[in-house]
Amino acid sequence: MRPSGRKPDELRPVRLTRHYTRHAEGSVLVEFGDTRVLCTASVEERVPPWLRNQGRGWVTAEYGMLPRSTGTRNDREAARGKQQGRTIEIQRLIGRALRAAVDLEALGERRVVLDCDVLQADGGTRTAAITGAYVALVDACNLLRKEGRIRRSPIFGQVAAVSVGIYQGTPVLDLDYAEDSEAETDMNVVMNEAGGFIELQGTAEGHAFRRDELNAMTELAELGVAQLIETQRQALEA
């Protein structure tokens, strides 16, 4: 029995609230149950030095957690003077995931920065960030097109992500913190709208997972991502 009472293949309630902030070209508040992440997409008319004069743009991400987004307060990383390895890993994951849906040449010589700030954490912050940041990115690119700064949208697909794992011997979808902290296996899966895998990150905590367990988890991920893709579509059409 899951602590939340959900079925093994059941997502938490998911909400995507667009245009959540005033200034960013794209902004989305994404909610996976009690996990809430603010995703903003900012367009900058410059690219990294290694991309100058190459006729293409860049999409990157930054990730952070508010000091009291968890049960106990954590100092801001800026106060510590450096980012933690976990933060660097997550923001690179978000950037890689979103670039998988972008034609960088169509974007032109500019970059889009996705800032993903965790307001409240209850498991699955990186997968929520990817799912919400995609919608913010689409809104930013649509604005560029509306303003005539690009001729066509550089977005050629959809990207969403979800966590899966093995909790008390059972493969489950979309782990919250109570499950994640006790899971024998935890995996984050990034996929596109065609059912293709962009990234899988899986770790066994208690015992090594078997091939049949891996298959069960990826099948759950496919089910969950398909629902998230549809939620994104509905949000963008609203």
UniProtKB/Swiss-Prot annotation:
It catalyses: tRNA(n+1) + phosphate = tRNA(n) + a ribonucleoside 5'-diphosphate. One of its GO terms (molecular function) is tRNA nucleotidyltransferase activity. Phosphate binds at R86, G124, T125, R126. One of its GO terms (biological process) is tRNA processing. InterPro entries: ExoRNase_PH_dom1 (IPR001247), ExoRNase_PH_dom2 (IPR015847), ExoRNase_PH_dom2_sf (IPR036345), PNPase/RNase_PH_dom_sf (IPR027408), Ribosomal_Su5_D2-typ_SF (IPR020568), RNase_PH (IPR050080), RNase_PH_bac-type (IPR002381), RNase_PH_CS (IPR018336). Its EC number is 2.7.7.56. Pfam families: RNase_PH (PF01138), RNase_PH_C (PF03725). The keyword Transport does not apply. Phosphorolytic 3'-5' exoribonuclease that plays an important role in tRNA 3'-end maturation. Removes nucleotide residues following the 3'-CCA terminus of tRNAs; can also add nucleotides to the ends of RNA molecules by using nucleoside diphosphates as substrates, but this may not be physiologically important. Probably plays a role in initiation of 16S rRNA degradation (leading to ribosome degradation) during starvation. Homohexameric ring arranged as a trimer of dimers. HAMAP family: RNase_PH. Belongs to the RNase PH family. This is Ribonuclease PH.
